[in-house]
Amino acid sequence: MPTKQRRTLYPDEAVEAARRNVEQFEWAKRRREEAVEEADRYLEGYGGLDGLWRLVTSQEIPRSCTVSFKNEAGSPITGTQFNEEHGSYGWEADPFEAPWKLTDPTCEMQFPTNDFGAYYESGLDEAGEFDPELADDDLLVNELYPERGESWGVDDGTGWVDDEGNRYHFVAYYNHWHCWYEIREILQALRDAFLLDGDRKYAQAGIVLLDRVADVYPSLDLSAWGPEAELYNSDAMSGQGRTMGCIWESVQIRSKLSAYDAFFPVMDDETAVAFLSDKADVYEIEGKGSGDAIRKNVEEGIVREVLPAVECSQIRGNFGHHQAALAMAGVVLDEPDGYTADALAHVFRPGEYVTEDDGTPWGRHEVTGGDVYPHLVEVVDRDGQANESPNYNAIVTRSVREIAEVLDGYDGTDEDLYEHPKVERMLGSRIPLLVLDRFTPHIGDSEETGNPGLNLDEELLVDAAARYDDPQLAQAAALAVENLDEIHGDVFDPDPERHAEVVQETLDAEGPLDLPSGNLAGFGLALLRQGENSGEPDETDDRRVAWVGYGRNSGEAGGSWHNHLDTLNLGLFGYGLNLAPDLGYPALGSTTPKRRNWAASTVSHNTVVVDAQPQKPQWVSEPKQFASTGEVDLIDVAAPEVYPQADEYRRTTAMVRFDDERSYVVDFFRVAGGEEHHFSFHAGEGEATAEGLDLLAQLEGTYAGPDVPRPGFREDTEYNQEVGNGFNYFDAVERDEAPPDSFSVDWDIVDTWDVREDGAEDVGVRLTMCNDLDEVALVDGEAPAKPGNPERLRYLLAKREGEDLDTTFTSVIEPYEGEPVVESVELVGVEAADGEEVDSEAVRAVKITLDDGRVDYAIRSSDPSRTYLIDDEIRFQGFFGVYREEGGEPAAAVLSDGTELGPEEGEPVLETDRGRLAGTVADFTRELAHENEIVVEFDGDVAEPEIEACVGEWIYVETDHDRNGAYEIQGAEIEGGQVVLDVGDRTTVRGYVDPEEPEQGFEYIPEEGAQFTIPRTYAWD
């Protein structure tokens, strides 16, 4: 008898609600129609039950997600042109009309050239499973292109090897995408059609397909195909998996589990039982004589397989993937005192992924526990981001939500992840990354080179908006859905319209999403925003954004291999475009030489390379200043870990408002230490023109040298292995080996992704640099060879060299449309008020003349305690300031962490007794909580108005571990001799004392007695 006795994912009352919704609401009716249409397409295309049953292949047909290993060879005909035009997965197929055939879209030729379908049928054994020993080798003949030779393009399942030694897995690729991946799509379509429509024919087909999968699933094992098979799967090079690599398997298995729950009540269906009984008579297959026998087969062959497969890493993905699969398996089987308890215990058990060389080709792999709570507490940061790139973090969030959703309402457990503070943070974690209502910063392995896309989960946001009291969730849900009439709850919700009411009430009260400047100090990302949301994401949108990334940059420091060594990377958005895009996702998401040495390396990003080597790993940098005044938005971040030889590696970036539609960015990048500094910057696709430089073209080679060639698509060169800094991926080199102290480079931006209707013909980015440099070069760097990407981008490389080098790269960067508003930029003199010597790198000031006659001074000082005379006319004491003159008179000023800013003659326009508050931490929230506090004691007397003025500022607590102590102050109250600072939903918890024994308590980000500062920012207009 089967164990399962009821539906648990889709209980009867939920199915009844769904069918009522289908009758009542147009959106639900459309969903049913779409599911039915898709299911009917599969039923017709595969010719009914028999075609679906035969779609399931067994272990002896390998699986590979690319045709050649890591897509190295591309196409047998057009080579890597295939990769550039169609990506890694661009082979075309028509399973209904031409099964087992792939079409190369670059030449329209088909592969394999033999009739593999006939060969496959000839090799079926008594169980209906393929055995190559039984197959007719006479069918392994090139039938399509005999002029190329009898064996050319022939694949027996193990691939075809060309004359150059490249192996092409046509059959394995087809089996991966058009058998097993297709099975997932079919089961989902049949499941949804049956649940929403009720027609038994969809359940009959689903039962037949699911039962056949259960026949073969226990024997499927990717690791049986050793490394020599040159198969490539989503397995992180572990070789583990079932129908496909272990990462994607953790998603694939869920469609099978949910299908079993959906079809469970009707598995006694006479048509399905009769069909499977007939198959059992033809083949040596047992257990098809009744609905309960079929249920038992599915439970034993699929559901109970999940726990051991997770334990041995055959099902293991990014965090949340396999945990969600295992939680679903436990809930579906519904055995609270047995398998369900074991499965959920593993999901929440502290544990890790363990590998060991045991002499076998792939080694031993084990997942000792799902580690859900330790991971949420220790790895997911206080901003709700996991340790991957943002797009992968979004996947993690969806998987964590699926765990929560599977357990929500299930009476076999008390676990409720929706109550966990980190889960609430995760569900809204995508929102602060949204830019111009159409972009997100492309950090790490994310997206393409400059493409639009929000990657918002509509269902997640709509549900979260109804679940939590956070207006931004509702605003983001409206943005994701676009058409407000389409906002609703899940189709299985008995009251799906309440979600629309929540969203509409929020929009009526708050308006559309219009994010202010923000600093995600836990994740490591600051976004400086100016302009307002017009409500229309088109070319009239005047919002502009500069961002600086400073989060996890490597799997070696708490991150993952989807991170890049890109600390203090700078990006720009404006005029509806991504104006300084990161390269995005490499052509292959693997550790290929080009990814390692170029796309994920430091020099391909808008940051600084020290000593011609990539950065070292870090968890997160240390923000020192963040401020937003309306006229000036500021971020200052130090990254002491990424270059240990540097005493300072720190970027200070400010966006300065010109008017309602235009801004410019002033950027100070201080590097103290090392012997060679390379400032790297690129804007979007477009011609780059230099002014003030005398550039000489280098006719051969790369930036690494005229005798160092650029590596091929998959080539790992001697330079890569011995140097590995990515300089050899720059070509089309032009150099000025004696550059002036000031020059500019102007990029004429191309609307690569056709975002704007007018093509953005007059949009540009101009960078003006004021530095004593040893060399300036303009070079080309390739974007990943993926459809839609630009072929290459033009980079500026500014170089300084010398012993114990100290550099503050000083730039003004202006996005513009039409004509720039910045007419000139010049470095101006700085003198100390006390007459002492001034370190010209420690304090810098630039004079920026604007096209309306106004003049701005931007000043940065490493020593805020000293007073300086700027350009013989401005007195300044502080860390950062912007001083604007109009007609020779003061017009506006912003001062951060300082006490004085104003004309040398006359009264200061900004003056205060202290630029910062300081003191020690007395206490803080010591548990995971939705609301958190830091209790402080100030040094000296601080008046109540000063304390109240801290709201909106940031506290920076010194830490001695890998997390920074930066928190936004959302409230401040005096209690006795202490001040309680409200830091909102950002937790003070860093991790468990011992993840194996959570009852021992937590470790914290702040510590009692730690020093802190609260820099103040003042504005005058």
Task: For every predicted segment, state its role.
Residues M1-T3:
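Basic/polar N-terminal segments that are highly enriched at the extreme N-terminus
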Residues R7-V15, D221-A224:
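An acidic-aromatic substrate-binding cleft motif
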Residues Y10, A14-E23, W27-G48, L52-R54, ...:
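Extended polysaccharide-engagement surfaces of secreted carbohydrate-active enzymes
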Residues D155-E182, V216, S601-N606, G630:
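N-terminal accessory/precursor segments of enzymes
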Residues Y174-G428:
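Aromatic-lined, polymer-binding surfaces characteristic
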